[in-house]
């Protein structure tokens, strides 16, 4: 089970380049149900995702490079390329009254999308359970919680007719660029 929340951000952190960075390329063989192929640095995966916005089933199967390259031309829609920066959260904040049984190890996955999706930037945080996800208080540099907005799901981005229109957005946080 994957349980995650998604956020837009106010600005890129100043220490961005001091964090681990993964290079990701992904494409969708199907979007209902979601069947995705991904290259993450030198690793390759086939992923099935069930229905849901914050919580859903997810299964990852390793692929060889040859299998990935064979499947890539069969993908529908746009290929998504992004840099993922990993920010460990040493002491996460939670709403008043929520106390986790143990201090969780959480990580912000900051996805900086490349063309044709630039300037889109999305922060994701995965949780061990839904209760913790609901109680999580995001850091100050996060802006809007877009977890329940389907437009921010990569499978929907892959189907955008005109991803170049994202470049005309006046704001990284403005969700209007995802319309159309």
Annotate each predicted stretch with a short phrase.
Residues 1-180:
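Phosphate-end processing signature that detects enzymes handling 5′-triphosphorylated RNA
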